[in-house]
Regions:
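Conserved catalytic core of the tyrosine transesterase superfamily
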Residues: 1-292
Length: 292
């Protein structure tokens, strides 16, 4: 199974445009499943093997969201194997996805955002880069994989726009705020000497040695500034995206526009943020109204 799994992960990355984060997690899921089925051959697998694996995960107290992801991974893997004529049918196709716990996305308030955006304050190349990354995450609501994948020619300084390659290689154009543009210019001026002049596609955000920043590098960088500011809460690059959507809706943006900015395929994915803003209104009402 291992060779088939490697081919599948390569297919995801090259043909489906899956992020580094997704391919890494799917690799973990497939290794776990391979260990569970032991020496059983792929063509001999049935839906009962998949159900047994899911039951095993439940006994190990995996969350419903983790089990759902592992099932989604297996569905995609077996679909790929059917396409490659390794299997005649997908044994995971008819298995229902466990209902996820409805968890509202966490976000930062404007004061917390301001503290984080001001955290990279040194006049160094690295902190200029870090500030522009934080500004971009909040200004345009990008996924970390989308930000890491940006190239020079994706950014339109004069128009204040950026071309983003989202999930499934779908492109969208997103505005970039003035504060983010100013930070990008400051970083840009110090960036040129470190670039790889021979690179055809020049990455927008680079490491000390001139290579493209990875998703993991951006996550580590965000954590560094969270610790520096002492905010005392769990914050990741995706928290900036949640904050972007919540603040946009708080200030009157319509749901469809926010959906387009975030690159959500379904409006229902964006609607979770309306629950966040409604909950905040209820809390404000309960704490301030004399007869609440």
């Amino acid at each position: 199974m291992n060779k088939r799994a490697e081919d599948f992960l390569s297919f995801l990355a090259t043909e489906k445009g899956a992020s580094e984060h997704t391919t890494k997690n799917y690799g973990i899921d497939l290794r776990e499943f391979s260990k569970f089925i032991a020496e059983k051959e792929l063509p001999g697998l049935t839906y009962l093997d998949i159900r047994s694996f899911l039951a095993f995960l439940k006994t190990r107290e995996y969350s419903k969201s983790s089990i759902s992801r592992k099932l989604a991974c297996l569905r995609s893997f077996f679909k790929y194997l059917v396409r490659e004529n390794v299997l005649t049918q997908n044994p995971a196709a008819g298995i229902a996805t466990p209902k996820k716990e409805k968890k509202l996305p966490s976000f930062m308030n404007p004061d917390e955002i301001a503290k984080l955006l001001d955290a990279p304050a040194k006049n160094s190349w690295e902190e200029k880069r870090d500030k522009s990354i934080l500004e971009m995450l909040y200004s345009s609501g990008l996924r970390v994989s989308e930000l890491a994948g940006l190239n020079h020619d994706d950014l339109d300084f004069f128009g204040g726009l950026v071309r983003v390659r989202g999930k499934g290689k779908k492109e969208r154009i997103v505005p970039v705020g003035q504060a983010a543009l100013n930070s990008l210019r400051a970083y840009w001026d110090m960036k040129a000497p470190r670039e790889n002049a021979s690179a055809i596609k020049k990455p927008l955000f680079i490491s000390r040695i001139g290579s493209r920043l990875t998703d993991r590098s951006v996550r580590r960088m965000v954590l560094k500034y969270v610790k520096r500011t002492g905010l005392g809460k769990e914050i990741s690059p995706h928290t900036f995206r949640h904050s972007f959507a919540t603040h946009m809706l708080d200030r009157g943006a319509d749901l469809r526009s926010v959906q387009e900015l975030l690159g959500h395929a379904n409006l229902s994915t964006t609607q979770i943020y309306t629950h966040v803003t409604t909950q905040r209104l209820k809390e404000a009402y309960a704490s301030a109204h004399p007869r609440a």
